[in-house]
Amino acid sequence: MAHTNPAVRAWDPAFAYELATIIQFGIKEMVEDDKDVIHYIAVYNENYPMPPKPKSVDEGIIKGLYMLRGAPKGDGPIVRLIGSGPIMIQVLDAVEKLEEFGVRSEIWSATSYGELRRDGLEVDRWNRLNPDKPAKQCYIESQLGNSNTPIIAVSDNMAAVPDMVRKWMPENYEVLGTDGFGRSDTREALRRFFE
């Protein structure tokens, strides 16, 4: 629902350092810059380990997407896994399972599909209004390129949330969401509807 209001910036951080970065940005934007915006941050009570903050991720956190960990060197296929919020732990678990099958994984954290969509729409508008100039790339395109590497985005939200950015994703983009919201009383029960 938060994505339907253009004055709302909706966030779904997975880790404490993402939350801290978003709060710091939000305070600056609302207080120091006096912007008429609301920051809606989904914060969960699920207990899981918090890793240290990687270097040079602030821009990606605020833009909505950053690479948490690159694929290990080696042979075999690569997949890009995108997670947000507490389901990131299952993304990290999936990496180990995929390694058993010889599949290497890049791990990406999506802190805001709404911000990614906002950027994509702004770039599309600029390109439409400036047909005589070289086309710009949106942030997703600059990060993920035009690769044939499969991308799987998983979310504890309905699949419609990560699907908001499908237009700017490379071709091999699949979305898995927990569309059983309202039919469950716990996160584990919610994930029974994961598809």
For the regions a protein language model found, what residue spans apply to each?
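Thiamine diphosphate
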Residues: 3, 10, 18-22, 27-195
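Ferredoxin-type iron-sulfur electron-transfer modules in oxidoreductases and energy-metabolism complexes
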Residues: 15
